[in-house]
Amino acid sequence: MKTINLISLDNSDVKYRIDRFPDGEVQFVLTEEIDRKEEYNVECRITNAEQLFILIQVGDILDRQGVVWVLHIHYLMGMRMDRVMSFERPFTLKIVGKMISQMGYEKCYVDTAHSIRTMLEIRECVSLETYPYKFLMEVVKEPDIEVVYPDHGALERYEGEEGDELYFEKERDIETGNIKSFIFKNEDVVNKGKCFMFFDDLCDAGGTFLGELEILKKMYPEAKFYIRVTHIVNEVGFDNLCKNFDRVYATESYRDWGKVAKEKGYDNFVVC
């Protein structure tokens, strides 16, 4: 299987270029012939409408060539807008899902989809999950780390049980929707309290993580604090995590954060 890597041309088996017309419109152009006997894997991130447009152009080329191909979306624009918020707002995920689903791929893989709605709106879609305890054993490889889920949604995502998992509940202001306080649940099952790892799918500005981190630091002042998220979508959040946690694990689904970490001198950031 050959890869068409829309994130990095250097890592693409199939070479291409992206032209831009005077009006700003982009056009994807293959610079070598497609082998119709070969299967293809398209790697991409969709953080904006232009990246989605480029992907659809790639799909058009592959479908007209009649080749078998699979799609791997590392970050999917609109996946947080997975419901109708009001009649005055669009159902963004449904719109994006329809555009992707019309392509002729065999299977679509999405890194840590925000909710099951992604699989319902995109044809033949599978979410690629990273589970906490497997991650600790295979990547971190340190003893005495206790997993903390930042909210009930994260707890449910990773199939934890309320009775024996550490997690936070958020108390919100009914009128404003702002978070008033965080409540740490199941403190009685804390084992050694030497190291805690927050685990979630996404970080925006990071306010929830920082508020909960402050509580745990007061409770366990000698402990180390790690965090693992799949998607960091905001440089403010990236800075907040790297400046406050002892170690930050994240993918480069949204942006090449490893390069940013080097530029800013964050030696506690790990791409995973």
Label the predicted regions.
Residues 1-272:
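PRPP-associated nucleotide enzymes
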